């Protein structure tokens, strides 16, 4: 065990890391006349063609953020990992919403995936799933593949500007890690903590990995003294589990499950003077932003010298509940008076992505590598953002009426 102390410009962090691994040693005999040659292998990329090929052979502009780079830069989230990427800009707009841009594009034209799988996210026309730059953590990540430029032929219109594909680790040995981080804001106040446990193992033909965390951040108060909370704060609980089986012929079957749960809030205050020195009111507004996403997948794949193929079914379910609540209290002569609690405004979203896909890649001669595949995707959304205003829902009056809509996508593609 060792202790690391890291300093940042905006906050200080104290980090404990405990790593355990199993190692296999074998005897080595050295000879004076033996000559050792070293080779640097060209990095491999999957996202550009949906099958593994070298970066040099890729038809797209590709950048890989390797595990070594992630470690050197101490990247904790996908936002951190993308800071050094060429042509990629991650920023927050005036409403605090995350945005991702590739070569100046809008966020809705950048597709973010994990292991080639889409993620259910906000029903937001502008930001799409850009919020995931802060949700996706790097403890279980092998590399991040970035495609700069249109990839609509393989991934659809939401990849018009490019693709960011997070590739997670494949268990190769028994290992694990425990991480804990506590941070402080510039003003010396506690910013909260982040904790994570990662385990992986291999037993004969079976492999597994478990990644679980608990994060709790605290509010950053307005330095001007208004009493406003400048950030959303609260708890975040991510967990993922993957189990795989490798058959004797080399084919692999894997099942994956992941869930992230967020309970966040943010408050602001305002004072309205009715009669100076005599009557005024204090208004406290609180926003509750609670999110949960659950992902399931089942994958069967295989490869040999001639071809590589995969068949996969997966589902991503995103639940959101956004509530705003106003509480007003009157003061007369400095004495507290009537408290008025308004009905909360509630916005709810449930989005379900269901996908069945498969593709096969094979060599045709010495110069051609053909990939052919198909994808069926159903994007079903329900909530308060789909109809006219005014219809009440449980707990208060919604911004919009509750309704449901679905879009079905079917794609067939061939690429050389």
Predicted feature locations:
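N-terminal Sec signal peptide and the immediately downstream disordered periplasmic leader
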Residues: 2-73, 80-85, 200, 237, ...
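Hydrophobic, lipid-facing positions within transmembrane beta-strands of outer-membrane proteins
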Residues: 42, 98, 162, 176, ...
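Outer-membrane beta-barrel pore domains and translocons
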Residues: 49, 149, 179-185, 213-217, ...
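N-terminal periplasmic accessory domains that precede
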Residues: 78-81, 98-101, 112-113, 131-134, ...
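Extracytoplasmic beta-strand/coil segments of soluble accessory domains associated
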Residues: 79-118
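Short acidic/polar hinge/loop motifs at secondary-structure boundaries
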Residues: 101, 118-148
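Periplasmic-side early beta-strands and strand-to-turn transitions of outer-membrane beta-barrels
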Residues: 173-187, 194-288
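Face-selective signature of the C-terminal outer-membrane beta-barrel domain
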Residues: 246-260, 287-416
């Amino acid at each position: 065990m060792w202790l690391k102390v890291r300093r940042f410009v905006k906050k200080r962090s104290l980090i404990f890391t405990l790593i355990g691994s199993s190692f296999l040693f074998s005897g080595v005999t050295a000879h004076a006349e033996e000559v050792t040659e070293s080779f640097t292998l060209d990095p491999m990329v999957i996202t550009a063609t949906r099958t593994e090929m070298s970066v040099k052979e890729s038809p797209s502009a590709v950048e890989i953020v390797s595990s070594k780079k992630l470690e050197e830069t101490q990247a904790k989230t996908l936002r951190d990992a993308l800071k050094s990427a060429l042509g990629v800009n991650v920023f927050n707009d005036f409403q605090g919403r995350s945005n991702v841009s590739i070569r100046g594009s809008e966020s809705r034209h950048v597709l973010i995936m994990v292991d080639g799988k889409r993620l259910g996210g906000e029903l937001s026309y502008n930001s799409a799933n850009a919020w995931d730059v802060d949700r996706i953590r790097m403890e279980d990540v092998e590399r991040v593949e970035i495609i700069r430029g249109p990839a609509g032929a393989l991934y659809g219109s939401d990849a018009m500007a490019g693709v960011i594909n997070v590739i997670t680790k494949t268990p190769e040995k028994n290992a694990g890690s425990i991480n804990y981080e506590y941070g402080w804001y510039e003003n010396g106040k506690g910013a909260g903590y982040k904790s994570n446990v990662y385990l992986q193992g291999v037993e004969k033909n079976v492999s597994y990995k478990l990644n679980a965390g608990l994060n709790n951040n605290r509010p950053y108060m307005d330095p001007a003294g208004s009493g406003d909370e400048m950030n959303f704060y609260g708890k975040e609980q991510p967990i993922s589990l993957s189990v795989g089986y490798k058959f004797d012929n080399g084919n692999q079957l894997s099942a994956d499950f992941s869930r992230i749960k967020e309970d966040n809030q943010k408050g602001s205050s305002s004072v309205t003077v009715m009669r100076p020195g005599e009557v005024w009111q204090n208004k406290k507004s609180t926003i509750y932003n609670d999110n949960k996403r659950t992902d399931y997948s089942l994958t069967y794949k295989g490869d040999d010298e001639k071809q590589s193929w995969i068949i996969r079914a997966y589902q991503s379910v995103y639940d959101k509940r956004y509530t705003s609540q106003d509480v007003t209290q009157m003061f007369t002569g400095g004495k507290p008076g009537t408290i008025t609690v308004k009905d909360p405004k509630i916005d709810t979203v449930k989005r379900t992505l269901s996908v069945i896909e498969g593709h096969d890649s094979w060599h045709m001669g010495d110069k051609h590598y053909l990939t052919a595949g198909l994808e069926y995707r159903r994007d079903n959304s329900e909530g308060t953002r789909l109809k006219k205003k005014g219809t009440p829902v449980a707990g208060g009056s919604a911004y919009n009426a509750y309704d449901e809509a679905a879009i079905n996508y079917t794609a067939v593609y061939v690429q050389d």
